[in-house]
Amino acid sequence: MQGRCAVTVGMLGGVLILAARMVYNTRMKLNTIICAAAVCGCVSFATAADEPAKTETPEPSKAELAEEEKGEEEEDSLVSAEAYFGVDSKYITYGVMDGKDPIVRMNGYVTFLDWWYIGAEVLFDVTKGNGKRGPYGWGNRAGKYTTVDAQTGLAHEWKLGETLGTLSIDVYYTYEYVARHKGTMNDTQYLDFEIKLKDLWFEPRLWFERDLMADDGTYVNLEVGHTFPLIGDGEDATLTFKPSFAQGWGNTLRTRGYGLSDDHGGLMDATIKGELVWAVCDHVKVKAYIAYCDYWFDRKLRDGARAYNGAWGGSNDHSWNFYGGVGVALSF
């Protein structure tokens, strides 16, 4: 009996010792696992802290990069130049004919610091009977200049955001040297102001002209239009089309100076125009346009325009004109 009790006590003691060891080993394993997890967590946290937060600084889009590059180019551009060579089917001024046959138009301008510019425009007659008619009679000037306009002015553009588009302002002075043939033909000086909003669906343009020398007349023209991209998109469009409508107004001095009315000013030429522009490359554009103009809103001035055009003879006895042109524009 005592022997069995001793064996039983011995077995119980062994079981307790084994259980204690298992508990001890389990605690050690748990401690090891916890320590390892803590070390891994610290390492992961340190690694994450060293890496840049990509979601906080996204990469700029291509459009943003292009806009930044364009802005840098504009800032770095101290001097720029542009030139134009084209042919117009008629010599039209204020909606009436100063030449019934085609003329060649050439101009060139140099701009400094994207503000001040200087340049000139020359018109050439290409036919024998296209000399500007009137009391001075310019005569046969085929292949010779008709006018030479020397210009200087200040022009700049400001981007006002998507709502207001781009504001463009141009103030310039023109000295117009005219051809001499019979008698003395006085030169003319002009002071002009243009303001327009671009990059909008509805693009308005206001042009104010003051004749400083010939008759001191004032002419104002308001134009509205929209540029549709036909090939490409936005400013990078390869081919665009712009339809527009413009209405001119002149005071009595302006209409008298052009022989339209001696004692009456008012609404003058109304013009509907369509213009195509093909951007051949970054520095070359081909431009073509067609236009129709008439004196719609003032009967007295319409009669004056009919008489002005009719002085060319033939079938020109009307107040309206249909004309067009094509040319190449270069920019550097």
Segment roles from a protein language model:
Residues 97-98, 120-223, 303, 308-322:
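Outer-membrane pore/translocation modules
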Residues 1-80:
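Cleavable N-terminal export/targeting peptides
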Residues 88-92, 125-129, 176-180, 209-213, ...:
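Structural signature of outer-membrane beta-barrel domains
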Residues 85-87, 106-112, 150-156, 173, ...:
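Residues on the lipid-exposed face of transmembrane beta-strands in outer-membrane beta-barrel proteins
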